[in-house]
């Protein structure tokens, strides 16, 4: 067992509740934050359901990179809250800023917060009393939002990775994590107990899932090799249930407050898994679900507009429609759904092509599927220093989609308009942007080289779905239509990109769409790899596999695969000796700058 990085104090349940009682008594001596917020009347609207609430929340945004900004390399209790607030480049939050955001079309503000790292000594001595000054500053920002007439979401947001304590090898550390979680939310809930139902608590950000065994300054013995997905799900469910129970136990308005439950990794597909469950609740119709949407990451999450893959084909718009439609699983059960983060994130070189179309289609579908959302923004779109959008079209989009513009319209009308607009967008979208692209049908198979460069700046069709439009500008690809057993060549030329080469590799694989369906049992036998015209020798043997039983795959560099999938891997001759998911060694000198890469392989039945 590795040495733990924080002193652990043994805590019994009796000690926890004794500490929380002290916290409650201390907070009772602090003037209620609600008293400083004249616009918040403390009213809890009787009979208001979670679905009805989300319709009232309109469109929202995040106060990104602000109160969650933290530095785990220099934890210094007692720093001024403003030290953190501006630490990641954002300006000091003001009343004028929130009022202008509301006027710009945002009816809801999500305030991400790093409570443990910025406002407790959990990493130093295992204590989790929140610094009153930090709590005061968050409350002050909440008051700004309430004065502006906005709904407010408060969460605990990554927060230095302390969540990995839940997955520690030490039962003592795991118990401390749960004690700290209960203690944190008790303090927050008591502080905001008198606020109206315009203030919503969110159980986590993206941490309830595979990050529950993340190593950090808080814990370096997380059980990354021991926790199964079933255990991840069970633990995430337990934490969410603890969140609900903790808030309800604080009484007052918190007995009926709307609570936002973070989905599994906030991923739509993983949250729709039957292993993930919404918590039980003593309040009726007061639970909301939180998920995020950044698909595809090669476009929405690309660090530069120049390096982002193309987006805007018929298939792209249809995919967004299908993904958001999956959330009806929850709305049909009466849960409100908040997409707590989404965006075609601006690159460091500006907005991406089709940003407006991405956001408009997203908002149309939210109208149709009865969802609300909060844009992830760190002054990339609404520039807080300027108190204005960076783009007139985005300003018009959000300015025309707020709650005020929907006044007097019933939901059926809004829903029908959203569906009609989305359908028109899909109908007008091109099938492909790529000239001479191979069109995949149910009756053919296509081979291609999936790729992410080492800086995640360049990408081509990563994933099991073949998409020739998912390509960074300037890349030229050679794909191959599979017509039967034979020899084929695929590859990529990076010389036309802005940087002129692929800076190493972060992920690479050969894919054959429909390979498992049309050619079951076939193997990909690599004959030759050429990088910049020279033969490159693979380090180990590549094996054939499939993640979805539709697309055949050979991993060339996939560091996320930690073991060979026995039973789902095959090679010529039947054995798996020498098999590796990383036959390309990214430390080889010829991998540092790749201008061209071509791979020739046989596609033949396994012998």
Identify what each model region corresponds to.
Residues 1-39, 44, 48, 373:
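Gram-positive cell-envelope targeting signals
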Residues 35-108:
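N-terminal carbohydrate-binding accessory modules
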Residues 64-93, 122-130, 173, 298-319:
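Acidic/histidine-rich helix-loop elements
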Residues 88-109, 119, 124-158, 162-203, ...:
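An active-site-proximal structural segment forming one wall of the substrate-binding cleft
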Residues 92-114, 323-330, 363-365, 372:
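Catalytic domains of carbohydrate-active enzymes, especially glycoside hydrolases
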Residues 175-309, 325-344, 368-371:
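Active-site region of glycoside hydrolase catalytic domains
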Residues 349-433:
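Aromatic-rich peripheral "rim/lid" segments of glycoside hydrolase catalytic domains that contact
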Residues 491-520, 566-590, 594-598:
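Extracellular beta-strand ligand-recognition surfaces/modules
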């Amino acid at each position: 067992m590795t040495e733990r990085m924080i002193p652990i104090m043994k805590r019994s349940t009796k000690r926890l509740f004794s500490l929380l009682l002290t916290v409650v008594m201390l907070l009772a001596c602090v003037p209620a934050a609600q008293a400083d917020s004249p616009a918040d009347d403390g009213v809890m609207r009787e009979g208001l359901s979670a679905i009805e609430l989300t319709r009232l929340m309109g469109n929202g945004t995040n106060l990104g990179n602000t109160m969650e900004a933290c530095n785990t390399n220099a934890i210094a209790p007692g720093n001024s809250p403003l030290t953190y607030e501006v630490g990641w480049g954002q300006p000091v939050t003001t009343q004028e800023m929130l009022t202008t955001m509301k006027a710009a079309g945002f009816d809801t503000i999500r305030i991400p917060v790093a409570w443990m790292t910025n406002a407790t000594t959990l990493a130093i001595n295992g204590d989790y009393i929140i610094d009153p000054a930090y709590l005061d500053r968050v409350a002050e920002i909440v008051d700004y939002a309430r004065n502006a007439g906005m709904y407010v979401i408060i969460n605990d947001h990554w927060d230095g990775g302390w969540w990995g304590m839940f997955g520690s090898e030490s039962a003592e550390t795991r118990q401390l994590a749960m004690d700290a979680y209960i203690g944190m939310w008790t303090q927050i809930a008591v502080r905001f107990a008198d606020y109206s139902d315009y203030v919503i608590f969110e159980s986590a950000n993206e941490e309830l899932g595979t990050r529950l065994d993340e190593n950090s300054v808080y814990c370096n013995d997380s059980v990354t090799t021991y926790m199964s997905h079933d255990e991840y799900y069970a633990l995430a469910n337990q934490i969410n249930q603890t969140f609900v129970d903790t808030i309800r136990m604080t009484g007052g308005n918190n007995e009926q407050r709307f609570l936002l439950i973070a989905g599994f990794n906030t991923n739509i597909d993983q949250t729709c898994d039957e292993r993930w469950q919404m918590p039980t609740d003593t309040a009726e119709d007061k639970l909301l679900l939180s998920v995020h949407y950044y698909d595809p990451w090669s476009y929405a999450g690309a660090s530069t507009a120049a390096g982002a893959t193309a987006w805007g084909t018929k298939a792209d718009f249809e995919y967004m429609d299908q993904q958001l439609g999956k959330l009806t699983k929850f709305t049909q059960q009466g849960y409100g759904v908040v997409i707590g983060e989404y965006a075609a994130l601006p690159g460091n070189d500006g907005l991406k092509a089709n940003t407006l179309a991405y956001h408009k289609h997203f908002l149309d579908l939210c109208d149709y599927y009865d969802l609300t959302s909060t844009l992830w923004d760190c002054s990339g779109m609404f520039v807080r220093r300027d108190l204005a959008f960076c783009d007139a079209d985005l300003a018009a989009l959000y300015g025309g989609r707020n709650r005020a513009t929907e006044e007097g319209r019933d939901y059926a009308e809004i829903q029908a308009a959203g569906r009609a607009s989305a359908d028109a967008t899909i109908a007008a979208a091109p099938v492909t942007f790529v000239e001479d692209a191979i069109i995949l049908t149910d009756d053919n198979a296509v081979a291609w080289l999936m790729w992410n460069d080492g800086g995640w700046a360049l990408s081509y069709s990563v994933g099991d779905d073949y998409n020739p439009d998912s390509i960074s500008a300037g890349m030229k690809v050679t794909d191959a239509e599979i017509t039967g057993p034979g020899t084929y060549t695929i590859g990529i030329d990076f010389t036309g990109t802005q940087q002129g080469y692929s800076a190493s590799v972060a992920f690479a694989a050969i894919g054959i769409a429909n390979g498992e369906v049309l050619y079951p049992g076939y193997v990909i036998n690599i004959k030759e790899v050429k990088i910049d015209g020279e033969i490159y020798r693979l380090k180990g043997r590549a094996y054939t596999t499939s993640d979805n039983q539709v697309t055949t795959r050979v991993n060339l560099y996939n560091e996320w695969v930690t073991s060979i999938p026995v039973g789902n891997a095959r090679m010529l001759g039947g054995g798996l000796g020498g098999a590796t998911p990383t036959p390309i060694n990214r430390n080889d000198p010829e991998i540092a700058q790749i201008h061209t890469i071509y791979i020739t392989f046989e596609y033949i039945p396994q012998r």
